From Swiss-Prot:
Alphabetized Pfam families for the sequence: Lipocalin
Coiled coil start-end: none
Full protein name: Alpha-1-acid glycoprotein 1
Gene: Orm1
Source organism per UniProt: Mus musculus
Species lineage: Eukaryota, Metazoa, Chordata, Craniata, Vertebrata
Pyrrolidone carboxylic acid: modified positions: 19
Entry annotated with the keyword Transport: yes
UniProt keyword annotations, A-Z: Acute phase, Disulfide bond, Glycoprotein, Pyrrolidone carboxylic acid, Secreted, Signal, Transport
Localization: Secreted
Length: 207
């Protein structure tokens, strides 16, 4: 996200308008269905963003990479967010819960007693989604991009670049993540391997 983290950005978000970046016209976010929620329940990689708002831009510049897991709860209409962010040579972990409103297609989060919202923009055929920020405010507008793979395809890059220019920003304002600087992925891989070894040991002892 970046998002100073997905968390920080959602905590700052006002009510937003979303667009379909693959078409010329703007539309209000589509309703969130169970199918969409199931699709969102996955591992996501922050790919890049273009922000006019200073807090958001500074957050991206201090972050080398970010990935996170979304786990939806259809009973409570909440989403568990578990986030891993590389800042410098350190890996920072965060977790929280997000709400969502099915009818207007928004995420929500309570922060400091205030509920804030973000419209979801799904790019399903690209395995990606976007969040839009203050599109009507020239000084605060922004777009961020997330995908299911860390390697952005030329087609998805072009879609995002066109979306950025369509909302009145310039391609030069886009900051893409350099996944070669990621540290959290390496740590996660080691933890998974350690977990597998831990499971093997008791079985070997019983053999």
């Amino acid at each position: 996200m970046a998002l100073h983290t997905v968390l920080i950005i959602l905590s700052l978000l006002p009510m937003l308008e979303a667009q379909n970046p693959e078409h010329a016209n703007f539309t209000i976010g589509e309703p969130i269905t169970n199918e969409t929620l199931s699709w969102l329940s996955d591992k996501w990689f922050f790919m890049g963003a273009a922000f006019r708002k200073l807090e958001y831009r500074q957050a991206i510049q201090t972050m080398q990479s970010e990935f996170f897991y979304l786990t939806t709860n259809l009973i409570n209409d909440t989403i568990e967010l578990r986030e891993s962010q590389t800042i410098g040579d350190q890996c920072v972990y965060n977790s929280t819960h997000l709400g969502f409103q099915r009818e207007n297609g928004t995420f929500s989060k309570y922060e400091g007693g205030v509920e804030t919202f973000a419209h979801l923009i799904v790019l399903r055929k690209h395995g990606a989604f976007m969040l839009a920020f203050d599109l009507k405010d020239e000084k605060k507008r922004g777009l961020s991009l997330y995908a299911k793979r860390p390697d952005i395809t030329p087609e998805l890059r072009e879609v995002f670049q066109k979306a950025v220019t369509h909302v009145g920003m310039d391609e030069s304002e886009i900051i893409f993540v350099d996944w070669k600087k990621d540290r959290c992925g390496q740590q996660e891989k080691k933890q998974l391997e350690l977990g597998k070894e831990t499971k093997k040991d008791p079985e070997e002892g019983q053999a």
